[in-house]
Design a protein with these regions (language model features):
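First exposed extracellular module after export/assembly in secreted or surface-exposed proteins
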Residues: 31-160
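Bacterial signal peptide processing site
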Residues: 24-27
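Prokaryotic Sec-type signal peptides and long signal-anchor helices
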Residues: 10-11, 78
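Bacterial N-terminal signal peptides that target proteins for export
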Residues: 1-10
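Alpha-helical transmembrane segments
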Residues: 13-17
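C-terminal motif of bacterial Sec signal peptides marking the signal peptidase cleavage site
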Residues: 18-22
Length: 160
């Protein structure tokens, strides 16, 4: 009799535990939002200069990190499928931590295009991952050139 009561109690606890776990809030499945402000589609980025990079990130729960990648688009590939590896004249990839925030206003000049970079069409890609691992990305077509580009005369102070 005691063993029947013990098994009944264990069974009841197991059922209640499963019910409690199944009633927890759904996990975060919403991707973060990327609003790339600078550079804009088709901008000319000057070789030998830094890039004025500005964007706004937001997430419904919590941001995690973002990554910027710049690579050549000499073969006019797209990012719908994996393209063959093309010779990359200039390549940049770096990640930044933005964890602990729901919103982040990003502004920096940490991307520098070396003097020996080959001019041409490039993809600037921004990836943002939230704390739950959901990822969003945007692609911006830019042109690297020895002439033209930004003069960096915009309304903010630079830190030395």
């Amino acid at each position: 009799m005691k063993s029947i009561n013990l098994f009944s109690i264990i069974g009841l606890v197991a059922i209640l535990s499963l019910w409690f776990v199944s009633c927890e809030k759904d996990s975060d499945t919403e991707k973060p939002v990327i609003n790339l402000i600078e550079p804009e589609e088709g901008d000319i980025l000057q070789i030998g200069s830094d890039v004025h990079f500005e964007m706004e990130l937001s997430d419904n729960v919590m941001l995690g990190s973002y990554k910027v990648e710049i690579h050549s688009n000499f073969d006019n590939h797209d990012h719908g499928t994996k393209a063959d590896d093309a010779e990359t004249a200039f390549f940049f990839e770096r990640s930044w931590d933005v964890s602990g925030k729901k919103n982040a206003d990003i502004h920096h000049h940490e991307i520098v295009i070396p003097e020996n970079s080959i001019p041409g069409d490039y993809h600037l890609m921004v990836y943002c991952t939230d704390a739950a691992g959901n990822e969003a990305h945007v692609v911006c077509n830019v042109i690297l050139s020895h002439e033209g580009g930004e003069d960096h005369d915009h309304d903010h102070e630079h830190e030395d």
